Structures are given as C-alpha cells and as structure tokens.
C-alpha cells in the first residue's frame, strides 16, 4: 500500500488556516452537549448492531458532500449496494460532509417523482467514524466520493485525522490502544477522489465518458458542468483537473468541453468563449453534470428552464442556468435525462468503478495517529 504522510500534513495545515465554511462547519462548544452525545449514541448503536449481525471485521465509510434530492438519495443507495458487492468482507456505511444537506434532507426539502416529501437521515463523518471505532473494526477504509482532490476532500482527510487522534468530546473518547493498533497494523486507509491522478484517472474518466457520449459529440457540443472551487479555496490546486479532463476529452473528440460553477475563468461564459474560438456559433449543445450526483446544481444551475433562470440584462449572472444561457445564445440545447432527471457520475457504472478501484488501492494513512496521553 502507498503511504501519504505529506497529504495528511497538508490537510492538517489547511484545517488550521482555512476559513470556516457554512456548508460543513461544526463546533462542539457551540452545540448542546446532550444532543451531541445523542448523535454519537445513535450511530454507535446502529453500527454495533450491524457488526453483530454481519460478523464482519472490516468497514468501508463512503463520504459524499450530500444532497437533498430524492434521485440523489437513490443514487447513493445504489452506490452503497455496489460497494457491498465489491467488498463482501466489509460492512459499508454512508455519510454526508455538508451540515446543510444533512439538515435539509432530514426535514424533506424535496419530493419524489410522485410529489411525496422525502426525508432521509444522514450524519457527519465524525459520527460514523466514532461508531466504527467504538465497534473496533480491525480494518477501516474511508472513501471520498468527491470528484477532485480539493476543499471538500481536505475536510474528509481532516475528519479521519481527528478520528485517529481521538479528537472527540470527553464523553466520546475512544480506546486509545485500539487507535494505536490501527496505526501499528497499517489498517486505516483513504480512498482518493475520482480525478486524483492526472496521469491515470483523468484519461480513464475521459475514455469512460467518451464511451457513453460519443454519439452526442458526433452531433454537436457535449458540455460537462462540474463544481470547482473559488480561488480562495482551491485546495491542492485541484481545479486544474477540469482543464486536464477537457484536454483529454478533446483528444478523443474536439466537441467536448468542461466548465464549472465556481472555478474562475471556467464558467459557462468561458466555455462559450472556447466554443466560439473554434467557430462553433450554433448547433446542438448537450449538457451533463460532472458531479457525483445530479442534485441542486444539476437541476437548477445546469438544467433550469424558464424566466426564473434567465435575466437578459445580466447574461453572465451565476443565477442564469446553463440551459437558458446557451439557448439564448442561439444554440439547440438538450439535457439528456433518465426518468425525469439528469444523471450524476455515480450512476455511470464505468465511472463508479473508478471510485471502487480507488478504494481497492486505498492508501495507508502514515503517522495519522498520535496518543491522547502525554509521553512519560
């Protein structure tokens, strides 16, 4: 197994210096202690029951940013099932890193296709990691379901480091000897995001996408919308993966483009500019989400239709959807759907297999553990 001491150190530095993000911040001192302990207890009991039932001694924890859309919940369910098939000797657990998604999913922000409000309970990585540790699994894999190794991935690394350093409230401290043994046995692993390796992952994902969308690319532009990070939060300079993916895709067909919601100089208007530089001023544009699931960004920022998604006085506004933007620029825009929804990357078997392979190749977290007790 590879060892990634440098990544842990970089993530630790990031967690100390980065600003607090509303979407995934938490502060134990600001929370009601009883409620906090209850969250740990709920997950501890759930994981203990699962381990007792299965008799398995390995655990896989899948970490997604999250969503509030039912089609995304179903995609997460199928992802978990795929992991259970790929790792028959492990119990598989799922969590969200976004507090906002956790809170809104629990109260039912969106409905299913029949109009029924859908509520789902998800928890932060710290609660599932604590529960897995309390159950004393002998081998733990934590798999990031992020697309790029950026801001959200750094938060995943920080969560694992906190777990290995017993960084919980006093009432939730784990057995320090157990954590030490995980480190000694090299039994705590981190699976990398989808586009982690520019030499391996980027061309593989490009090939998988081309296998799916070559027919569309033969008819017109195929534009993928990723998320990206603003410059301030461009952890590990991961935004470059979107540019690298576009280069790899265009080597297969020049009609592929990759833009983002948040990466500077790679918004929808920048994609249009690159298209026009090649003389593509009309024709078909097929839009696809380059995100793990098709949630709010895919349904609204990418595929939103109608007046609420278009302000002609502010054409390049982030509130204008990609669909309306390209349509009003004179293109024939299509958003392919399955059922009533666009697809996310986890719903594409060839892409999901890249994540699964990352778990199989997961890297041992060297020097993640430090005893909570002072050295004598």
What feature does the model see in each segment?
Residues 25-376:
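Extended amphipathic ligand-handling, pore-lining, and cofactor/metal-binding catalytic surfaces
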Residues 1-10:
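Bacterial N-terminal signal peptides that target proteins for export
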